[in-house]
């Protein structure tokens, strides 16, 4: 519900600028709460802004030198509190809140935020309704990890009795959703991944896989030929991951040459 009370915490679900770029401004509009024994100037400083919470990998990524041509992230957008491991849990306004780390998915620092009593999940970019999964390999993302994260969302969501509604799912981009929307997105991601994996096992090149159009039946809903994340980029990213997962067997001639070399050296 909406309240006039000051914001106490900002949760950064991952490292991307469109999700952390407002951290400093929002934090300055809020106040955190210090312990009862923190008084005077120290206490005032400790409560002057809202806390910014993120997984430790977000802080690690922000602390690295930015890519060429990009400005460093302002220090005020950095998390002030980080957590290690799988999750952080706390009570807030009488409600249990879980911040759950999903590794190696969209990035390596993604978190879900689950409000248990309200039955609301904020997913960050681990789920969207407007595009194919963005796998940021430069920041530790993988397709297999992304699908695992979608399954993790489904582990904590429930439908209502007509299979629509139930747990409210707040995506990183797009409309408010429910469990059924996540199921459809998870199924799409799994089908496309499995198609490309099978093509890789057959020894197809990237261009041959693209010619097969493994996303064709989903393109009207999620596809794009323009922008920072195109359908072609999505396919190529999965292809490269599947090649690492299923490396091509050495050519017979090369194997024979290696065996001969071993024999001559004996």
Language-model regions, residue ranges each:
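Extracytoplasmic/secreted cell-surface and envelope-processing proteins
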Residues: 18-22, 61-64, 130-132, 178-180
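Metallo-beta-lactamase
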Residues: 42-191, ...
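Accessory terminal helices/loops
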Residues: 32-35, 159-166, 175-266
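PEST-like low-complexity, intrinsically disordered acidic/proline/serine-rich tracts
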Residues: 34-47, 58-60, 99, 133, ...
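Sec/Tat-exported extracytoplasmic proteins
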Residues: 2-7, 24-30, 34, 56, ...
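Active-site metal-binding motif and surrounding structural segment of the metallo-beta-lactamase
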Residues: 1-42, 48-50
């Amino acid at each position: 519900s909406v309240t006039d009370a000051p914001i106490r915490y900002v949760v950064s679900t991952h490292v991307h600028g469109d999700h952390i770029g407002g951290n400093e401004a929002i934090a300055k509009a809020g106040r955190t709460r210090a312990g009862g024994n923190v008084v005077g100037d120290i206490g005032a400083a400790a409560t002057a802004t809202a806390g910014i919470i993120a997984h430790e990998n977000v802080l690690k990524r922000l602390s690295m030198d930015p890519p060429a041509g990009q400005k460093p992230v302002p220090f005020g957008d950095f998390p002030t509190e980080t957590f290690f491991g799988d999750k952080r849990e706390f009570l807030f306004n009488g409600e249990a809140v879980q911040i759950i780390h999903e590794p190696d998915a969209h990035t390596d620092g993604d978190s879900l935020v689950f409000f248990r009593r309200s039955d609301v999940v904020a997913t960050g970019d681990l789920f969207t309704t407007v595009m194919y999964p963005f796998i940021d390999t430069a920041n530790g993302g993988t397709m297999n990890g992304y699908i695992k994260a979608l399954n993790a969302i489904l582990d904590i969501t429930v439908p209502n009795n007509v299979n629509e509604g139930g747990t409210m799912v707040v995506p990183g981009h797009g409309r408010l959703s429910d469990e059924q929307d996540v199921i459809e997105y998870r199924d799409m991601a799994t089908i496309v991944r499995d198609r490309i994996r099978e093509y890789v096992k057959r020894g197809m090149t990237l261009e041959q896989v693209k010619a097969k159009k493994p996303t064709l039946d989903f393109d009207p809903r999620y596809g794009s030929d323009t922008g920072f994340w195109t359908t072609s980029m999505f396919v190529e990213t999965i292809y490269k991951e599947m090649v690492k997962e299923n490396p091509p067997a050495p050519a017979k001639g090369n194997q024979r040459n290696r065996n001969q070399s071993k024999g001559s050296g004996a």
